[in-house]
């Protein structure tokens, strides 16, 4: 009896903090005003809940949101962020936000095979699509529901922040080719922040983008039924550090890339830019006959670099041609709008030759396939610097809860060299390796695969660091506090000497001054960086763990998550640079700082 009681106490103490919530709040009505969901409650979605009327739904770190099961997939429960509304879901590395099924006790009681127990999360925005009308009705929601409409003309649209989030056991097959995914994004703009998300054991795709320009980092698609990542209708966002792993018996494409609907000459073309992906299939010898690599269809383009694609039952890459259409992916390749480079192609059940791994373009909408295998010609071309039929030597691939999953490259892995340097554009992190992971395991701790015992217990660290030597920082330049008029512009200059590039942290702090009792701070500073007359970077509202870490290392004061302070991290060659600070719609106090990271 004493042993039983002690075991119960230990189990409670070891449980996630979210299990200690005392109240269950059943959500039956749409969110039409600014609302906060707290970690002291568990929220149970009774139906599809729409955040609408321009409202912001804030979800505290550690909060659990559950979806009630429905007999008919048409009625699947979901959280939908409508156009004009925002989600402010900012978990942390130690207290992620969890979306899951009602029956999930967060104790591991549900298995990987229990998929589709509720709908999922849908975010809709006003960014552009390539449909004829420039709008769409998102899959999985009745076309008669106006709150399911997405699209518009604002590529910078902001639907909020979605960070450190797990989405478990989601997905609903409403009809053929009509599904709710783990995370569905329709027309979401690049003003939105999406990073550190794990979609686990879903009944359809992990992620699907319908048009839009949203950028994303640190995405995990784990053991889902269909594709890891899927885009349609002219998606043009950027992505880095994407990881996908298939179940031994489930999973379709590593990535399914569609461009537009008929006619397939709709613009803008789908042309996302992706760096540092690790995509593992069901196993080259698995029984899952649907396990495929990449497929490019319709008029999609896209640039993919520093990718590891490995362990799929069938082919590595297939590129569609449609001679009956004015545009197709083969034409995007010929135009230079589609590229795969500096990537490792590992083991595939289709075979070891290039013609087996990279299948000939196939005609799916009429006409005959061309005589030339464009796919092989492109991927094997020397300028692409791809490594073909090469074992990436990952530390561990596992599809069971044995803590054997370790997607980091092992000693001697070819992924440790041969990478392409990402653009220095303010979004991409500087990397010198192929794949989503270096020696650091950024998935550890916050993700579902970590919480449920798939992932190794190896120490976690943050790979989102500039590739620089040493570990110290110094304040390189600091302006005095200044007052900016409503229409004022502040210019500050600095010079980097020497012969080597340097990484700098630049801050325009307005809202961050509130904690020091400074009244009248600049509410929304905008920071731009120039070399000569050339603008090379800009930032409005900062985000990202990299900034948090480098600010701490520099010894400066931390910024509140979600504040509208502006921050840039750039690796710059020696020379002179100018910064410009302006304010959006107001005047106020602001501090300008430049730190050199050494």
Where are these regions (language model features)?
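Positively charged n-region of N-terminal signal peptides that target proteins for export
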Residues: 1-4
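Bacterial N-terminal signal peptides
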Residues: 7-17
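A sequence-level detector for low-complexity, Ser/Thr- and acidic-rich stretches
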Residues: 467-598
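Beta-strand/loop edge motif enriched in small/polar residues
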Residues: 22-467
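General helical structural elements
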Residues: 6-7, 511
């Amino acid at each position: 009896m004493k042993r039983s009681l002690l075991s119960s106490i230990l189990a409670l103490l070891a449980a996630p903090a979210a299990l200690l919530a005392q109240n269950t709040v059943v959500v039956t009505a749409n969110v039409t005003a600014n609302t906060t969901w707290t970690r002291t409650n568990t929220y149970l979605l009774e139906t599809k809940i729409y955040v609408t009327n321009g409202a912001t739904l804030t979800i505290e770190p550690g909060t659990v949101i559950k979806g009630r099961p429905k007999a008919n997939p048409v009625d699947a429960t979901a959280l939908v962020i409508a156009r004009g509304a925002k989600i402010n879901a900012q978990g942390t590395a130690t207290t992620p936000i969890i979306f899951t099924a009602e029956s999930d006790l967060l104790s591991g009681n549900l298995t990987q095979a229990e998929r589709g127990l509720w709908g999922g999360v849908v975010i809709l925005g006003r960014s552009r699509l390539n449909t004829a009308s420039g709008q769409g009705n998102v899959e999985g929601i009745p076309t008669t529901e106006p709150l399911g409409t997405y699209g518009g003309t604002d590529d910078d649209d902001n639907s909020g922040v979605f960070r450190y989030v797990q989405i478990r056991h989601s997905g609903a097959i409403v009809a053929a080719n009509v599904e709710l995914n783990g995370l569905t994004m329709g027309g979401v703009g690049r003003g939105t922040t999406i990073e550190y998300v794990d979609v686990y054991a879903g009944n359809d795709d992990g992620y699907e983008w319908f048009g839009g320009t949203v950028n994303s980092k640190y995405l995990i698609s784990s053991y889902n039924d269909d594709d890891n990542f899927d885009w349609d209708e002219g998606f043009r966002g950027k992505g880095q550090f994407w990881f996908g792993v298939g179940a031994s018996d489930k999973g379709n494409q590593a990535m399914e890339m569609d461009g537009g609907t008929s006619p397939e000459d709709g613009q803008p073309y789908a042309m996302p830019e992706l760096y540092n992906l690790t995509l593992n299939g069901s196993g080259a010898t698995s029984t899952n006959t649907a396990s495929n690599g990449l497929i490019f269809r319709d008029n999609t383009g896209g640039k993919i670099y520093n990718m590891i694609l490995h362990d799929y039952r069938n082919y590595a890459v297939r590129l569609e041609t449609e001679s009956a259409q004015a545009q197709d992916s083969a034409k995007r390749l010929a135009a230079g709008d589609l590229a795969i480079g500096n990537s490792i192609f590992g083991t595939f059940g289709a075979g070891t030759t290039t013609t087996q791994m990279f299948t000939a373009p196939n005609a799916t909408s009429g006409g005959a396939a061309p005589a030339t295998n464009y796919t092989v010609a492109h991927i094997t071309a020397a300028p692409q610097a791809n490594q073909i039929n090469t074992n990436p030597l990952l530390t561990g691939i596992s599809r069971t809860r044995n803590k054997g999953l370790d997607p980091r490259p092992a000693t001697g892995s070819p992924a440790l060299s041969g990478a392409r340097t990402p653009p220095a554009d303010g979004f991409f992190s500087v990397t010198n390796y192929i794949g989503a992971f270096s020696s650091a395991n950024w998935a550890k701790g916050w993700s579902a695969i970590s919480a449920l015992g798939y992932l190794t217990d190896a120490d976690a660290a943050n790979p989102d660091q500039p590739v620089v030597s040493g570990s110290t920082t110094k304040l390189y330049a600091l302006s005095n506090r200044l007052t900016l008029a409503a229409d004022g512009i502040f210019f500050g200059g600095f010079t980097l000497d020497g012969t080597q590039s340097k990484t700098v942290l630049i801050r325009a702090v307005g809202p961050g001054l509130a904690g020091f009792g400074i009244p009248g701070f600049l509410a929304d500073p905008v920071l731009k960086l120039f070399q000569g007359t050339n603008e090379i970077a800009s930032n409005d509202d900062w985000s990202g763990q990299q900034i948090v870490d480098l600010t701490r290392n520099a010894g400066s004061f931390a910024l509140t998550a979600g504040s509208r302070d502006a921050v840039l991290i750039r690796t710059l060659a020696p020379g002179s640079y100018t910064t410009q600070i302006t304010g959006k719609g107001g005047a106020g106090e602001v501090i300008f700082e430049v730190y050199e990271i050494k």
